[in-house]
C-alpha cells in the first residue's frame, strides 16, 4: 500500500498554499478562525439589495436628515458617513457566500453611483445638502471610488487569494481606519493644539488627532480581533499594539485623501506576520 505524505499544518501555512472556498479543515491550520457570524446568505441579489439599502440609509438619508433638521456640525456629519462606510464591511463579509460576489458588489456600486454623483454636483441642492469640502465638488465621488476599490482589493487578496480563513482580517483593517481616522479628524479639529509640521505632511494634522487615532484604532482592532475574529485576548492585544501605531503613522503621511486606501492595507499587511507566528506557536 502506498501512503501519500501530508504536509504538517505549519508547513502548509508557510508554503503559501491557498485555501479553497469551503471552510478550512483542521489540517489546513488557518491563521484565523472561520468567520463566526453564521452561514452567509446564498442569494447574491438579496445580499446586494440589503447592502445598497444600507448605503442609501446611512450615507444619504441620515446625513441629509442631520443637515436639514439639526444643527450638527458639517465635519461631524462627514465622519458619521465615514464610520457608516466602515461598518458596511461586515455586510460585505457576512452576506456573500463567495468572494467574487463580495468583490463585484462594490465595483457595481461605483459604476452606478459615480455618474449619479457627477450629475448631482451640477445641481444647487448638492452643495446645500451634502458636506462636500472641495471647491469644485467631487469629494463624495472620490470617496466612493476610493472606499469601494479599497474594499475590492482587500477582498481579492485576503479572501479570494489567501482564502476564507483570512476574511476576518479585512474587518480588522477597516475598523482601524474607520474609527481611528474619524477620531483623528474630530479631535484634531476641536482639541488640536500642536500641529505636525513636516514637508511630507499635508493639511493641518495635529499630535492630539494622531494620538486619538492611535487610541481609537487600537480599541477597534482589539474588539474586532477578540469578538469577530475570535482570537485570544493576548493575541488581540498584541494586534492592537502593533496595528494602531502603523495605522496612525500612515495616516499622517497619506496625501489627498488616500489614507482611505493606505491605512487599511498597511494595517492588514502589518498583522499578517503576527497571525502567522501566533498560529505556528499554537496561540
Language-model segments: which ranges?
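Polybasic, lysine-rich low-complexity intrinsically disordered segments
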Residues: 7-8
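Interhelical loop and helix-boundary elements at the membrane-water interface
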Residues: 42-47, 61-104, 114-221, 226-227, ...
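Alpha-helical transmembrane segments
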Residues: 54-56
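Charge-biased, low-complexity intrinsically disordered regions
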Residues: 109-112
